[in-house]
Amino acid sequence: MIEFVYPHTQLVAGVDEVGRGPLVGAVVTAAVILDPARPIAGLNDSKKLSEKRRLALCEEIKEKALSWSLGRAEPHEIDELNILHATMLAMQRAVAGLHIAPEYVLIDGNRCPKLPMPSMAVVKGDSRVPEISAASILAKVTRDAEMAALDIVFPQYGFAQHKGYPTAFHLEKLAEHGATEHHRRSFGPVKRALGLAS
């Protein structure tokens, strides 16, 4: 992996999202400005960490970061805008929520939302840039907790296990029980379950 070269600036925020692929729930984003004086060991892409490690790092990030913020776009916004534009909106909300304005924003992936400060997309940033790794961890822990809470209300769908992704089990239960109000109606499998697909 090519080592990432930072822009020449002090306050850098990392931004990442979780939940573009699921059929249910919000897309959740996070923005994090780390404190160089308080380094956090073991930051890595949230998908490569155990749940226990993610939870521990999540608390450490919240405690040590100069600033952190969560953003989200709800299922109805995803349906109205499409998943890409809703994700960009959620990223804008996360950056706007930082109580310290960053001088530069690094975003995981290959495109940036419109922001009031310079920004750059970093492919595989969640494993190359600690600020993005930290954002990835916060977003994933937050969204996983939301799916666990939804699982208590709708136990028949198994949200705590598959986190809303279109697994065979989820698709089977969607066909059997129909969609909840938290499902994304613009997504093909949900449309089909509701009889809306042409």
Swiss-Prot record:
Catalytic activities: Endonucleolytic cleavage to 5'-phosphomonoester
Binding site for a divalent metal cation: 16-17, 108
InterPro entries on file: RNase_HII, RNase_HII/HIII, RNase_HII/HIII_dom, RNaseH-like_sf, RNaseH_sf
Residues annotated as domain RNase H type-2: 10-198
GO MF annotations in UniProt: manganese ion binding; RNA binding; RNA-DNA hybrid ribonuclease activity
Domain of life (superkingdom): Bacteria
Residue stretches spanning the membrane: none
Location of the protein in the cell: Cytoplasm
Cross-referenced Pfam families: RNase_HII (PF01351)
Keyword Manganese applies: yes
Cofactor field: Mn(2+); Mg(2+)
Cofactor binding note: Manganese or magnesium. Binds 1 divalent metal ion per monomer in the absence of substrate. May bind a second metal ion after substrate binding.
GO BP: any one term: DNA replication, removal of RNA primer
Coiled-coil residue spans: none
Alphabetical list of PANTHER family matching this protein: RIBONUCLEASE H2 SUBUNIT A (PTHR10954), RIBONUCLEASE HII (PTHR10954:SF18)
Similarity section: Belongs to the RNase HII family.
Protein name: Ribonuclease HII
Organism annotation: Escherichia coli O127:H6 (strain E2348/69 / EPEC)
